[in-house]
Curated annotation (Swiss-Prot):
Biological process (GO), any one: shikimate metabolic process
Organism: Moorella thermoacetica (strain ATCC 39073 / JCM 9320)
Lineage, top ranks: Bacteria, Bacillati, Bacillota, Clostridia, Moorellales
Family: Belongs to the shikimate dehydrogenase family.
Keywords assigned: Amino-acid biosynthesis, Aromatic amino acid biosynthesis, NADP, Oxidoreductase
Residue positions binding NADP(+): G132, A133, G134, G135, A136, N156, R157, T158, P159, E160, R161, L228, G251
Reactions catalysed according to its record: shikimate + NADP(+) = 3-dehydroshikimate + NADPH + H(+)
Protein's UniProt name: Shikimate dehydrogenase (NADP(+))
Gene Ontology molecular function, alphabetical: NADP binding; shikimate 3-dehydrogenase (NADP+) activity
Disulfide bonds: none
This enzyme's EC code(s): 1.1.1.25
Pathway(s) this gene product operates in, as recorded in its UniProt entry: Metabolic intermediate biosynthesis; chorismate biosynthesis; chorismate from D-erythrose 4-phosphate and phosphoenolpyruvate: step 4/7
Residues involved in shikimate binding: S21, L22, S23, T68, N93, D108, Y230
Pfam families: SDH_C (PF18317), Shikimate_DH (PF01488), Shikimate_dh_N (PF08501)
Amino acid sequence: MIQVKASTGLVALLGHPVQHSLSPLMHNAAFAAGGQNLVYLAFDVKPGDLAAALAGLKALGFRGANVTVPHKEAIIPYLDAVDPVAARIGAVNTIVNEDRCLKGYNTDGSGFLRSLEEAGFDPAGKRAVILGAGGAARAVAFALATAGCGSLVLANRTPERATELAGALAGAGLPAPVVYRLGDAGMRSEVEAADLVLNTTSLGMWPRVEETPLPPDWFRPGQWVYDLVYNPLETKFLAGARRRGCRVISGLDMLLYQGAAAFTLWTGREAPVAVMDRVLREAMGASSGGPAAGR
């Protein structure tokens, strides 16, 4: 258990809303296990209050912060510095306060790739379909492209946003994805041909658990299907894929590994991943036998 003292450092979660987040549970367990004199707190920050919240982090000497929806892209102009990877992605999910200089990083992409590695999927040369075009989609699209993914397809409810992301990838010298409107019939052949189908939208997240971004009959046996939503642990999207014989990965895995990378940025230490994984799965009512891929 963390003993809060006058010297205890603070780490924040900035988002709107944040009441559902498991990050405080995960990081406080990690700080305790690693002997770090830090405590992690969630703050519901409305978009109009973002600049003031960052000024508060700096004034109060916070060690750093995580950034979640809807601030991952909007926060960049308010930071003092941005890591080149995060700048290229155009989204920040982690902040480190370095001598009153707030520097933004993106651990979503590296956390996503590590979750694929732990599950046994190598994206090099593979075909991937990404559903969504927000901050998380940007991170995983850049991660897949830089990892040598053979082809990318983007699908979003507003295709203009997906087209902008495709342009950003092309502008960075990476292969430009094909773009669809989410749910268009023409997508079906792309989904069926894909090695990896990834949902980065909020469709299916509690309490709207009956929603799914794709009909399950678009999947084929042997595909990898990944949902960044982790509440519920098995979404309707993943349940449909599992019934079709797909190998599935829960969003809890990306939460775990992006969190582990953020822990290292704040502390300079290797994260206690086993502790973080156990706490997350206990919170979700799942077994703690490791990442949820294939289960």
